[in-house]
């Protein structure tokens, strides 16, 4: 019995702290079906705020707190940005945007399993993913292991930093939320 106990103690001494954190982040992601959160998004010098719901895999609905009535919706295949006040309507295949990877929980889990933590401080854990010539920084809260935000370069080559707060997990959702809005002229 002492031999087994010694082996267990030895194993935990050689297990890097990073491995434990990575396992916790991965387990948290695996348990997460959806999240709702407030966000602050900085694109170049412009700051926008709003609320989003992510429903894995690859669905998102965001409503911006602005006077324009801006929304962003992905049904898992396509991404639409619609601005109600101006009638502007932008349609993109999701696979051509960096959000395609951010919204893919299984992709994130696979990458985190392969990566080392790229940065860490008392509050945040960061993983840097490079995929298809895109650099994506994914942030997690060190204490809760919740997704905390991401940094990407958007399809217009703008640096986009999104930080999230007030997270609610695994809520009952109406899937109609993720239907693409119609274009209105």
Where are the regions that the model predicts?
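Sec-dependent N-terminal signal peptides
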Residues: 4-13
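Boundary at the C-terminal end of the N-terminal hydrophobic targeting segment
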Residues: 16-19
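A short, Trp-centered hydrophobic/proline-enriched beta-strand micro-motif
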Residues: 27-47
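Short, solvent-exposed coil/turn segments at beta-strand boundaries
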Residues: 31, 53-59, 74-78, 121-122, ...
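Short hydrophobic/aromatic-rich beta-strand segments that constitute the beta-sheet cores
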Residues: 37-39, 60-64, 79-82, 127, ...
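An acidic-aromatic
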Residues: 52-101, 160
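Flexible, surface-exposed loop/linker segments and immediately adjacent secondary-structure boundaries
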Residues: 85-124, 129
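Gly/Pro-enriched, hydrophobic low-complexity segments
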Residues: 110-185
């Amino acid at each position: 019995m002492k031999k087994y106990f010694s082996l267990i103690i030895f194993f935990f001494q050689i297990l890097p702290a990073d491995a434990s954190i990575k396992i916790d982040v991965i387990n948290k992601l695996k348990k997460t079906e959806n999240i709702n959160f407030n966000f602050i998004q900085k694109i170049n010098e412009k700051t926008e705020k709003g609320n989003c719901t992510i429903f894995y895999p690859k669905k998102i609905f965001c409503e911006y707190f602005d006077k324009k009535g801006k929304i962003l919706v992905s049904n898992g295949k396509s991404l639409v940005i619609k601005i109600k006040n101006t009638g502007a309507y932008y349609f993109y295949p999701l696979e051509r945007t960096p959000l395609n990877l951010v919204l893919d929980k299984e992709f994130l889990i696979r990458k985190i399993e392969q990566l080392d933590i790229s940065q860490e401080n008392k509050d945040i854990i960061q993983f840097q993913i490079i995929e298809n010539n895109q650099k994506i920084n994914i942030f997690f809260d060190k204490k809760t292991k919740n997704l905390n935000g991401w940094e990407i370069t958007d399809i217009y080559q703008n640096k986009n930093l999104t930080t999230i707060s007030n997270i609610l997990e695994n809520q009952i959702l109406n899937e109609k939320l993720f239907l693409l809005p119609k274009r209105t002229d």
